[in-house]
Amino acid sequence: MTPTLLSAFWTYTLITAMTPGPNNILALSSATTHGFHQSTRVLAGMSLGFLIVMLLCAGISFSLAVIDPAAVHLLSWAGAAYIVWLAWKIATSPTKEDGLQTKPISFWASFALQFVNVKIILYGVTALSTFVLPQTQALSWIVGVSVLLAMIGTFGNVCWALAGHLFQRLFRQYGRQLNIVLALLLIYCAVRIFY
């Protein structure tokens, strides 16, 4: 990979990992509401699911020259529905101001999000088909880059969770407003899938 292509790869992956999306918003919300320690199950579920999805993206990118548009369209609708459900859960979740104690979303729920998270699927397919496959079809490289993509994504999730933890006091003071803003951002993510 040339230095120019490598630079473009890092720029694409880091910007994509650090911009708002379902995972980052969920990580921020969970750490704000429950603290970083209580959110580690959420982050672990995201990380494992992210890795598996990146490996699946590698298989898809490697095996298929063109992805079936009907399958992508169906996946987009499933992803949008799940993201809207997450938005509803965040918008209606009790805050510390409400005096109710809640548990963070489960490991398995955050794990399942990855399989309908269109942002990371497109992230994986785009990175692999744009930066890796034109350079090499070696399976070891494709799998290695898939693992790297999952690590970069996990880094973004942890950064957002740490932001939620560090600004927890401020976010808790305005918990209801924050939940509404985060829910609206998720709705925006769902709409952006189609436009």
Curated annotation (Swiss-Prot):
- Pfam families tied to this protein: LysE
| Membrane topology of this protein | Multi-pass membrane protein
* Membrane side Cytoplasmic: residue ranges: 29-46, 91-104, 163-176
Gene Ontology CC entries for this record: plasma membrane
Q: Which UniProt keywords apply?
A: Amino-acid transport, Cell inner membrane, Cell membrane, Membrane, Transmembrane, Transmembrane helix, Transport
* Known catalytic reactions: O-acetyl-L-serine(in) = O-acetyl-L-serine(out); L-cysteine(in) = L-cysteine(out)
InterPro entries per the record?
LeuE-type
Q: What does this protein do?
A: Exporter of O-acetylserine (OAS) and cysteine.
Family, as annotated? Belongs to the Rht family.
* Annotated protein name in UniProt: Cysteine/O-acetylserine efflux protein
Q: List the taxonomic lineage.
A: Bacteria, Pseudomonadati, Pseudomonadota, Gammaproteobacteria, Enterobacterales
